[in-house]
A protein has these predicted regions:
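A short small-residue
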Residues: 25-31, 89-96
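Von Willebrand factor
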Residues: 17-81, 92-132
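Short, mixed-charge, low-aromatic patches
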Residues: 1-9, 62-72, 107-111
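Short, flexible, mixed-charge acidic loops at enzyme active sites
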Residues: 79-89
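DG-centered beta-turn motif at the end of beta-strands
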Residues: 26-31, 43, 68, 112, ...
Length: 139
């Protein structure tokens, strides 16, 4: 899906789903330290369980806008704001794997905050009230 189609899809979703949104930003450490004691696998399993439970709950599914950012040597967008189902699909398509020796936590948090500010403006533009966003950092 190209950027234009993605925007149209989001506009359609905003028009059809009038639920107040809760923006949930998962900021995930994928530095080499996450190899210790299988930490990365536990994080991926936990995110998958969270996304599946969110997707299976009607109220949560309609309200949750989920974004996933990973950070190791660099910060990377894994899944832009969307449904739990979209985030799960993106997580399966681009699994978070431990890479690099550095942990650029600030870069990951800054990217997440920038994405959050943009998405908050998108919601305001369609008069959608949003709850206070969650920023969850796993390191």
């Amino acid at each position: 899906m190209n950027e234009f189609e993605n925007l149209l899809s989001r506009d359609l979703e905003f028009a059809q789903n009038k639920s107040n949104r809760i923006m949930i930003c998962l900021c995930i450490d994928c530095s080499a330290s996450m190899l210790l004691q299988g930490a990365m696998k536990k994080v991926n399993d936990g995110m998958e369980a969270f996304l599946e439970k969110t997707n299976n709950d009607t109220l949560a599914r309609d309200a949750a806008d989920i974004c996933i950012v990973s950070f190791g040597d660099t910060a990377q967008l894994v899944s832009d704001f969307g449904t739990a189902d979209e985030a799960l699909h993106n997580l399966h398509a681009h699994p978070i794997l431990p890479v690099g020796a550095n942990t650029v936590l600030a870069a990951g948090v800054n990217m997440t905050l920038e994405l959050l500010a943009v998405h908050q403006k998108q919601l305001e533009a369609v008069n959608n009230n949003a709850y206070i966003p969650w920023l969850i950092i796993i390191s």
